[in-house]
């Protein structure tokens, strides 16, 4: 993701803050005096874990997942990261997932080629932030482009890899159209995988906003060493703002996270976080859901995860800040994770994941192509 340094939501976020009765000094105070219930308020340091650039030179790290249990070539406590760009920095052309240990050792978990997709996902390979790990299977969004621009992108697919990094299954069609982000809820022998789709009418609109972004729930069944199978697909969210962008590739619903059955969505284009109730079981779309929070410290929210205390953590595309929002919708803490460029940190942040035992927060820094830790 490479938002223009003058990304429009910078101004929009500030204006929304003023409209909510928050001045810039108030926002600074909120950052300095994090509420006692804040998760990120307990951390005061950031450090580099490792470069995310593998031997083939892939750039622009997106998805971040912490491995919960060892299986195959996946090792407990390690972090897997998907790359969206190739060595020429063309978006929608990255083909690798790297595995990084907490001490910074990096290896290639998977290098996905077009041949491995066997014609079931035309257009090439471009791995998004839609990265999940369920029952030992890695599922990653593939949203490829021929030249780094959304105008030449394809609908893509979800690529299913086993714990050794081998492509075993492809999920495509049935509403999967530009899979931009994902999250999952596991249960015994099954999982609900939520996928944000951002290519519904965006190419034809040629940069204009269309409200056709969707969130799909894929209900998957698992049986031994066989790849997961789709038991059903439900559209649980719809009507999200989306558009193509020459710098950001696309702007649309991005980060997803589930807590107690509620799906939280980073509605990037509208500069807000929304909540879809009963997402794991519902049979109909909730539209864009209810608004949890908007404006304030948000500035084009992208990556999203849920903190151990149940708060929603998002990172901005329009600046280098992380924002923590309580379950009641109050923005309880925020801080800069990157201040490079102008505006500070714009376009640097994307995927994030809570470290084991809540000991910190892993996040990717696209500006430096690194995995970092807030601790």
Regions inferred by a protein language model and the residue ranges of each:
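Secretory targeting and sorting signals
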Residues: 2-30
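Surface-exposed loop and turn segments in beta-propeller and other repeat-based domains
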Residues: 35-57, 99-125, 157-180, 221-248, ...
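Beta-propeller domains
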Residues: 45, 69-76, 82-110, 150, ...
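Beta-rich, blade/repeat-based domains predominating
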Residues: 53-77, 92, 114-138, 143-144, ...
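Short loop/turn segments immediately following the C-termini of beta-strands
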Residues: 84-86, 143-145, 153, 187, ...
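Surface-exposed loop/turn positions within WD40 beta-propeller blades
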Residues: 94, 103, 155, 164, ...
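A short loop-to-beta-strand structural motif that recurs across blades of beta-propeller domains
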Residues: 95-98, 156-159, 207, 211-216, ...
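Loop/turn-rich, solvent-exposed surfaces of beta-rich toroidal or solenoidal domains
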Residues: 262-264, 268-272, 291-336
